[in-house]
Amino acid sequence: MTEKHLSTQFEAELGAISGRVLEMGGLVESQVAQAVYALTNFNDETAAHVLQREGRVNQMEVEIDRDLSDIIARRQPTARDLRLLIAVSKTIANLERVGDEAARIARTVQRLINTGVSTRLRLPVADLSFEADLAIAQLRKALDAFARLDTAKALEVLKQDDQIDQEFDGLLRKLITYMMEDPRTISSSIDLIFVAKAIERVGDHAKNLAEAIIYVVKGTDVRHTSVEDVENVVR
């Protein structure tokens, strides 16, 4: 078999893996969106659907990881290709954790519904929806950057990460005020604080994806690096 033929096969295998990563990304993005919908509408059926699909997310991580190991064992990837394979491994781990956060939100919804909180108290769930919209947009942008290995778009994700953190801080203050003003809301407000934290972590995982993309293209590890320094790397 010629070297060119082997190279073409390898490129096809890399393309197939990247396609599976994007498929997994689309699934976890949908999981987060549905979990938040379940929360804002106190919809037990949607929450249950999210939990039913959690196993599929975990299965995809295992399958893609297995394929990665197989490629590394059979091929001799160049430095950049090896960086891509490493980045894919990190990416699917982050996506699996996003799926975990979606499941955590869904379980919280079921608990709130089962305790009757949704009918007894007026909770600030709409504020959580805005934070979630930001996090989902970040995740979508990071996946788009992954599909194109677009460092400029990855940099945008890093720049916008603080906005989600600020939303979380604002929600935390609001929920603390809720608890102080009405002790009946303490238990449910604590649940919503954990939901807000789960949403913030979705943004953190999107940031991790963006950093992995820059690592693939530029060969520089930009974790724990200021946005200003990352800009210099991307230029």
Regions found by a protein language model. Name each.
Residues 1-235:
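Cytosolic, long alpha-helical scaffolding segments
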